[in-house]
Amino acid sequence: MTTIVSVRRNGQVVIGGDGQATMGNTVMKGNVRKVRRLYNDKVIAGFAGGTADAFTLFELFERKLEMHQGHLTKAAVELAKDWRTDRMLRKLEALLAVADENTSLIITGNGDVIQPENDLIAIGSGGPFAQSAARAMLENTDLGARQIAEKALTIAGDICIYTNHNHNFEELPSKA
């Protein structure tokens, strides 16, 4: 799987991810870009799960953003509705972490849209490790969002065999 982490702090929101793609217990590629910008660079998103499934979801989510003039929550809810009701989409196995300047959300394959506590998201196989590390740093340091995301991904990569140390990040200014 993978690790995606999103942190919002001090006027910044960042989503970072590792670059490992696996098939079973074999590493197939080490530099997959799982984090990207959407909707005229106003939304950042990361995926955990099947790569082909995630690219399909990115494309569908970007269409929803276009339909709803960039309104993140509305687009996420509409994607989740489609994901839940469309027979083909239900077979897709991926999670999305998405953020704009105001909101951070998790969109699940079950059709759920979750606004996380403390604006901290960590998904994928290394998610629990990254979340624990990031939460400790949020509560006990003055580090910025990018530094926290970097360190959380590094810790997850040290522990989770499906997460590597080839990281990619996208950042936006945050109003939240």
Swiss-Prot record:
A single MF term (Gene Ontology): threonine-type endopeptidase activity
Sequence intervals crossing the membrane: none
Annotated residues for binding of Na(+): 157, 160, 163
GO cellular component: HslUV protease complex; proteasome core complex
SUPFAM superfamilies xrefs: N-terminal nucleophile aminohydrolases (Ntn hydrolases)
EC number: 3.4.25.2
Regulation (activators, inhibitors): Allosterically activated by HslU binding.
Chief location bin: cytoplasm
Catalytic machinery residues: 2
GO BP, sorted A to Z: proteolysis involved in protein catabolic process
Keywords from the named record: Allosteric enzyme, Cytoplasm, Hydrolase, Metal-binding, Protease, Sodium, Threonine protease
InterPro entries: ATP-dep_Prtase_HsIV_su, Ntn_hydrolases_N, Proteasome_sua/b, Proteasome_suB-type
Subcellular localization(s) per the UniProt record: Cytoplasm
The reaction(s) this protein catalyses: ATP-dependent cleavage of peptide bonds with broad specificity
HAMAP family from the UniProt entry: HslV
Record note on quaternary structure: A double ring-shaped homohexamer of HslV is capped on each side by a ring-shaped HslU homohexamer. The assembly of the HslU/HslV complex is dependent on binding of ATP.
Purpose: Protease subunit of a proteasome-like degradation complex believed to be a general protein degrading machinery.
PANTHER family: ATP-DEPENDENT PROTEASE SUBUNIT HSLV, METALLOPROTEASE TLDD
Protein name, as recorded: ATP-dependent protease subunit HslV
Designated gene of the protein: hslV
